[in-house]
Amino acid sequence: CRRLALEGYLAIAPELYFREGDPNDFADIPTLLSGLVAKVPDSQVLADLDHVASWASRNGGDVHRLMITGFCWGGRITWLYAAHNPQLKAAVAWYGKLTGDKSLNSPKQPVDIATDLNAPVLGLYGGQDNSIPQESVETMRQALRAANAKAEIIVYPDAGHAFNADYRPSYHAESAKDGWQRMLEWFKQYGGKRN
C-alpha cells in the first residue's frame, strides 16, 4: 500500500477476514489459510470490497479510476472482483490461485469467471510455484483466450510463489521488480493517469 501511495494512488489494504479472527493468532501461513482465510465466504469479501470502494469515493478517491491488486489469496480475489464490480477499470493479480475445488464459501474459481471480466486483468505468476501448477495457468490462459477477455498472464520462469514478498525466502528480486513495473504500467494504461 505504501509503495502505491508513494506513486500517487489512494491505496487501501482492507482487513477482509476480521470477522473470523485475528491473523496474528496463527503461527504459520498454512494454519492461517486453513484456520481463518478459508472460513471467509467470497460473497462477503466481494461485498466488503464494494464498501471499501464506496468509502474511497467519499474520501478523495476517484471511482472512475477504481483499480485492485492482490497477492496470493488476494490475487484470487482480484480475479473474482474483476468479474464482480462493473466500475473496476484495471486489476493486477499476483500469484493468485486460478483453479481448484469449489465450496459453499468459494463457489467459483477465477477460471470459471473468465467470460465475466469487467476490467482488464494482468496476472503475474512464478514458473517454479509449487502451489499453482503451470497446467492451471495454461488452463486460465485458454479460458481467457476463448472468452476474448482483455487479460494477460506473465510467468516468471525462475520465480516461485510469493516472489514479491521481500520479507520471505521466496522473494525473487528480478521478477518482483519487473512485475511491479508491469503493474504500474497496467494501471496507467487502463486505470488512468495519477493526479
What are these regions (language model features)?
Residues 1-195:
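N-terminal cap/leader regions of alpha/beta-hydrolase-fold enzymes
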